[in-house]
Amino acid sequence: MVNETEALPCEGGCGLYGTRVNNNLCSLCYKKSVLQHSPALRFEPETEQSQCCPPTNSPAVEEEPVKKRRCGICKRKVGMLGFKCRCGHMFCGSHRYPEEHSCPFDYKQSGRLALATQLPLIRADKLQRF
């Protein structure tokens, strides 16, 4: 007598092995046969939601292509080692310094603004003379 777990050729003809538990079908053919015979297991979207809320014809959102990360001066691929400058561009290791790529960002002014916001202005009261 044949065990229930003994592998037999699939009756679906797919070339795989089936079991008696699955009516001599492999797992793939068994899943297909179960879905064909019982419509309750099939996934169908609910019609109530689609009737109450009409579908809107919104324009398809196009995914923007991934920008390749290249140096702003020599156009060499920088990958993960790219350096983003305060001027907003990406640079390689040799062009990352502001002097190398003629950076238009004003570092002195940004430093002055940072100090002005961080340090309070301290003034002594005016001295009165007799």
From Swiss-Prot:
<feature type="binding site">
    <location>
        <position position="71"/>
    </location>
    <ligand>
        <name>Zn(2+) 2</name>
    </ligand>
</feature>
<protein>
    <recommendedName>
        <fullName>Zinc finger A20 and AN1 domain-containing stress-associated protein 10</fullName>
    </recommendedName>
</protein>
<dbReference type="GO" id="GO:0008270">
    <property type="term" value="F:zinc ion binding"/>
</dbReference>
<feature type="zinc finger region" description="AN1-type">
    <location>
        <begin position="65"/>
        <end position="111"/>
    </location>
</feature>
<dbReference type="GO" id="GO:0034605">
    <property type="term" value="P:cellular response to heat"/>
</dbReference>
<feature type="binding site">
    <location>
        <position position="101"/>
    </location>
    <ligand>
        <name>Zn(2+) 3</name>
    </ligand>
</feature>
<keyword id="KW-0862">Zinc</keyword>
<dbReference type="GO" id="GO:0005634">
    <property type="term" value="C:nucleus"/>
</dbReference>
<dbReference type="GO" id="GO:0071472">
    <property type="term" value="P:cellular response to salt stress"/>
</dbReference>
<dbReference type="GO" id="GO:0005737">
    <property type="term" value="C:cytoplasm"/>
</dbReference>
<dbReference type="InterPro" id="IPR002653">
    <property type="entry name" value="Znf_A20"/>
</dbReference>
<dbReference type="GO" id="GO:0010038">
    <property type="term" value="P:response to metal ion"/>
</dbReference>
<dbReference type="InterPro" id="IPR000058">
    <property type="entry name" value="Znf_AN1"/>
</dbReference>
<dbReference type="GO" id="GO:0003677">
    <property type="term" value="F:DNA binding"/>
</dbReference>
<feature type="binding site">
    <location>
        <position position="95"/>
    </location>
    <ligand>
        <name>Zn(2+) 2</name>
    </ligand>
</feature>
<feature type="zinc finger region" description="A20-type">
    <location>
        <begin position="4"/>
        <end position="38"/>
    </location>
</feature>
<feature type="binding site">
    <location>
        <position position="92"/>
    </location>
    <ligand>
        <name>Zn(2+) 2</name>
    </ligand>
</feature>
<keyword id="KW-0863">Zinc-finger</keyword>
<feature type="binding site">
    <location>
        <position position="29"/>
    </location>
    <ligand>
        <name>Zn(2+) 1</name>
    </ligand>
</feature>
<dbReference type="GO" id="GO:0010043">
    <property type="term" value="P:response to zinc ion"/>
</dbReference>
<dbReference type="GO" id="GO:0070417">
    <property type="term" value="P:cellular response to cold"/>
</dbReference>
<feature type="binding site">
    <location>
        <position position="74"/>
    </location>
    <ligand>
        <name>Zn(2+) 2</name>
    </ligand>
</feature>
<dbReference type="InterPro" id="IPR035896">
    <property type="entry name" value="AN1-like_Znf"/>
</dbReference>
<feature type="binding site">
    <location>
        <position position="10"/>
    </location>
    <ligand>
        <name>Zn(2+) 1</name>
    </ligand>
</feature>
<keyword id="KW-0479">Metal-binding</keyword>
<comment type="function">
    <text>May be involved in environmental stress response.</text>
</comment>
<feature type="binding site">
    <location>
        <position position="26"/>
    </location>
    <ligand>
        <name>Zn(2+) 1</name>
    </ligand>
</feature>
<dbReference type="GO" id="GO:0010042">
    <property type="term" value="P:response to manganese ion"/>
</dbReference>
<dbReference type="InterPro" id="IPR050652">
    <property type="entry name" value="AN1_A20_ZnFinger"/>
</dbReference>
<dbReference type="Pfam" id="PF01754">
    <property type="entry name" value="zf-A20"/>
</dbReference>
<feature type="binding site">
    <location>
        <position position="14"/>
    </location>
    <ligand>
        <name>Zn(2+) 1</name>
    </ligand>
</feature>
<feature type="binding site">
    <location>
        <position position="103"/>
    </location>
    <ligand>
        <name>Zn(2+) 3</name>
    </ligand>
</feature>
<feature type="binding site">
    <location>
        <position position="87"/>
    </location>
    <ligand>
        <name>Zn(2+) 3</name>
    </ligand>
</feature>
<dbReference type="Pfam" id="PF01428">
    <property type="entry name" value="zf-AN1"/>
</dbReference>
<feature type="binding site">
    <location>
        <position position="85"/>
    </location>
    <ligand>
        <name>Zn(2+) 3</name>
    </ligand>
</feature>
<dbReference type="GO" id="GO:0010045">
    <property type="term" value="P:response to nickel cation"/>
</dbReference>
